[in-house]
């Protein structure tokens, strides 16, 4: 028999009345009624009310015991009177009359009064659920995790990972672990480097993704691979990105097309989202090309809950009387229009605030706008420069109704798309156009294979260098590199990128040619990707994969705005683990063993 408990704090019911039971847990709440003290005892599973009578010799002990101390009690289960039943907890029809108390661990505050004050305040948050600054919460994460909301997020994370693993195994995937200490690779972010003691001056890298290893598994003859993979990237924190470490459902398949990958992911994620959320889940996963996404949504991560669509109205303003846009177009710029439904009667301040916000927050040089009154009359700073024919074309292009308005952004194509996309998001939110009770997915496909880097003044890979280009070797040899598309795809949900993937290049000549266009010599490719080059000489199946982010999936399903809320021991925005004190300095002796010297 377990000496600490016969039941959990979520088990006892009316049919347990008169039983002697033993319970263990944390002293969650305490109510002193003079001759009686009522205690809510909490364990991982729930809460049970305990009753301490003043005729017991441990009455003073429980009276003086601090909240969150750990105790073990033995007592008799009694039914509560009808007027004291607590329907908010599953054990609310009973209470335990305590006959024996043993204190397992008592809370002791720090001797420094300032630190003790901090400890008391964070301890109080467990029962009050009030919020505290992030660094304080993370410093006392072991207490923060006792809060119901935070604990439930971690439980949900565990359940989601278990479900993902189950679904992958059901679909015939093998779970295989790939190395954590590996070589640096050009994934697009900075590597975390680990010095080698046995090889002075050389470094391992923590994997940004198991990219090459999973491709090597396909070359090895494994047909379907997956793992819940830890990945490491030295990136700044964002609301949807944790600094340093994250997890992804990493998978790869042989002899597949892009659509085969899509079908696996769609069926898997639909089941997971439908199971773990009360929100509705749209079964449709539309395919949107990168070019279309940037035009219509101003982003390659479009939120399809937002009904607003951006339109290209460059030709409408070409040779128009509005000289600012006319001049921009003559210099190769574009004009994008963003509809704003039912805003024509808003005061001037409404439009001025949007313009000011776009300038300060989005880097826009400015925004133009036209309002269309309910009688169809066009007004605003731009309207007087346009004839009725051009105004009608704007109405048609933006599909607006009388009483609507239209905002305009003009700049170079990429900048105009970015600004218009952010204005679209702003309007969707402020005009309450976004349905918060649904998940909408989409695939972004046909990404550019290459991009011109203005800083380095050279062509570079737009995304994944190991993907298959449309048209294969022929397009690499015959086309303008900036016109070549890739079999690369992103999965987006409610404006958040959940995963990236690609059909991989499985031909050595294509690999050499693609890297040559990006400025890599054959020797550099052989040196940096030696394992992959060797493998590609020995029969490579067509293969592809994807890696949905586990943290982001949990964040969406937990309905949390910040990804750190679904990570058990997160870093803060500065990439610091304030609980463990990492990163930290190391002893000079250790540095010498690693042939390292810190430059101040």
UniProtKB/Swiss-Prot annotation:
> What is the protein's given name?
Aspartate--tRNA(Asp/Asn) ligase
Q: Can you say where in the cell this protein is located?
A: Cytoplasm
* Site residues, Important for tRNA non-discrimination: 33
Origin species: Wolbachia sp. subsp. Drosophila simulans (strain wRi)
Instruction: Supply one GO BP term.
Output: aspartyl-tRNA aminoacylation
Residues that hold ATP according to the record: 233-235, 497, 549-552
The GO terms this record gives for MF are: aspartate-tRNA ligase activity; aspartate-tRNA(Asn) ligase activity; ATP binding; nucleic acid binding
Specify where the region named Aspartate lies, as residue ranges.
211-214
How is this protein annotated for GO cellular component? cytoplasm
Binding site residues for L-aspartate:
187, 233, 463, 504
Enzyme Commission number, as recorded = 6.1.1.23
Tell me the disulfide pairings in this chain. none
Q: Does the keyword Ion transport apply?
A: no
Task: Name the principal localization, coarsely classed.
Answer: cytoplasm
Q: What does this protein do?
A: Aspartyl-tRNA synthetase with relaxed tRNA specificity since it is able to aspartylate not only its cognate tRNA(Asp) but also tRNA(Asn). Reaction proceeds in two steps: L-aspartate is first activated by ATP to form Asp-AMP and then transferred to the acceptor end of tRNA(Asp/Asn).
* Superkingdom, natural source: Bacteria
Keywords (A to Z) from UniProt: Aminoacyl-tRNA synthetase, ATP-binding, Cytoplasm, Ligase, Nucleotide-binding, Protein biosynthesis
What family classification does the UniProt entry report for this protein? Belongs to the class-II aminoacyl-tRNA synthetase family. Type 1 subfamily.
Q: Keyword tRNA processing: yes or no?
A: no
What does the subunit comment say? Homodimer.
Name the catalysed reactions: tRNA(Asx) + L-aspartate + ATP = L-aspartyl-tRNA(Asx) + AMP + diphosphate
